[in-house]
UniProtKB/Swiss-Prot annotation:
Annotated function: This protein binds specifically to 23S rRNA; its binding is stimulated by other ribosomal proteins, e.g. L4, L17, and L20. It is important during the early stages of 50S assembly. It makes multiple contacts with different domains of the 23S rRNA in the assembled 50S subunit and ribosome. The globular domain of the protein is located near the polypeptide exit tunnel on the outside of the subunit, while an extended beta-hairpin is found that lines the wall of the exit tunnel in the center of the 70S ribosome.
Gene Ontology BP annotations: translation
GO MF annotations in UniProt: rRNA binding; structural constituent of ribosome
NCBIfam families linked: rplV_bact (TIGR01044)
Organism name: Oenococcus oeni (strain ATCC BAA-331 / PSU-1)
Keyword Lipoprotein: no
Taxonomic placement: Bacteria, Bacillati, Bacillota, Bacilli, Lactobacillales
SUPFAM superfamilies found in the cross-reference section: Ribosomal protein L22
Recorded GO CC terms: cytosolic large ribosomal subunit
Protein name: Large ribosomal subunit protein uL22
Length: 120
């Protein structure tokens, strides 16, 4: 029962970026071809481009090495960022009080699959 695998997945856990900022980047590359996504990420000024670029690289490497898929045919099928654990810190304020600082983390997941429209 040999099943033909057409997708590969990569996930980065506890990335030190807020999920809201990561989602801004992921929304721009979702549904694009891998080469187009690399070009977009290279010139996008947002802060979350570096971890998304690394996860995309990992997903493409998984597709090529584990499942023998061609990089030119890959499309970003799914891209999402879930909330990871929040690190809580305190900043001293006036009159002996303190303000809470939440340092948010994300779990970034990208799934790449072969393009269904081959030759079209």
């Amino acid at each position: 029962m040999a099943e033909n695998v057409t997708s590969a997945k990569a996930t980065a856990f506890q990335v030190r970026i807020a999920p809201r900022k990561a989602r801004l980047v992921l929304d721009t590359v979702r549904g694009k071809s891998v080469n187009e996504a690399y070009a977009i990420l290279k010139f996008l000024p947002n802060t979350g481009t570096e971890p998304v670029y690394k996860v995309l690289n990992s997903a493409v490497a998984n597709a090529e090495n584990n499942f023998a898929l061609d990089r030119a045919d890959l499309v970003i099928k799914e891209a999402y960022a879930n909330e990871g654990p929040t690190m809580k810190r305190f900043r001293p304020r006036a009159k002996g009080t303190a303000s809470k600082i939440n340092k948010r983390t994300s779990h970034i997941t990208i799934v790449v699959s072969e393009n269904d429209k081959k030759g079209a």
